[in-house]
Swiss-Prot record:
Disulfide bonds: none annotated. This is Senescence-associated protein DIN1. Induction: By darkness, ethylene, cytokinin and heat stress. Pfam families: Rhodanese. Is thought to act during the early stages of leaf senescence. Residues 83-183 form the Rhodanese domain. InterPro entries: Rhodanese-like_dom (IPR001763), Rhodanese-like_dom_sf (IPR036873), Thiosulfate_ST/Rhodanese-like (IPR052367). Transmembrane segments: none annotated.
Length: 183
């Protein structure tokens, strides 16, 4: 469901100016009793385009909490600069994808594993990430095309990791831009 938003949105004591026209997509929804639900729209940046997500939640500070769960995404060249500036690199591709090639100094913790013709979520993902990174480490997160890394980034933000940045597009544009890789 898409709609155009007014130029100013106000939710409780939180207000934000919104550039018209923007789209709303119904993505994040939490299962809460209908009596406690509130609907807000938060910015989501994926593949270098801004979108707005309709978020349903019953928490007091809905806008701030919803926005905290939407990771920042950056193009691969910016991600490379962040890595050079000291950010740690988390590659969430499968071990097979990682072994074919990966960005220099990346640490592999799969977000999903291949099972038959499909994929299943790694049930130990948060525990494995926590064994390599602290909650306040600055981390860039990448995968093959940008989808798994966005999901992983969102999960890490929800779990309390604060320095999470998603790599828009993933490993494909990384190699297309001839950025350094290890095999």
């Amino acid at each position: 469901m898409e709609s155009t938003l007014n130029t100013t949105a106000r939710i409780g004591s939180w207000s934000s100016f919104i550039s018209p026209p923007l789209q709303v997509c119904e993505s994040f929804k939490w299962k809460l009793p209908k009596a406690t639900r509130r609907v807000v729209s938060v910015a989501d940046r994926q593949n270098s385009n801004f979108r707005w997500r309709k978020v349903t939640t019953g928490r007091a500070n809905v806008a701030a909490e919803a926005a905290a769960r939407v990771p920042t995404s950056v193009p691969v060249r910016v991600a490379r600069e962040l890595a050079q500036a000291g950010y740690k690199h988390l590659d969430v591709r499968t071990p097979d994808e990682f072994s074919i090639g990966h960005p220099s100094r990346a640490i592999n913790v799969p977000y999903m594993y291949r099972v038959g013709s499909g994929m299943v979520k790694n049930p130990s993902f948060l525990r494995q990430v926590s064994s390599h990174f602290r909650k306040h480490d600055e981390i860039i997160i990448g995968c093959e095309s940008g989808e798994r890394s966005l999901m992983a980034s969102t999960e890490l933000l929800t779990a309390g990791f604060t320095g999470v940045t998603d790599i828009a597009g993933g490993y494909v544009p990384w190699t297309e831009n001839e950025l350094p890789v290890e095999e």
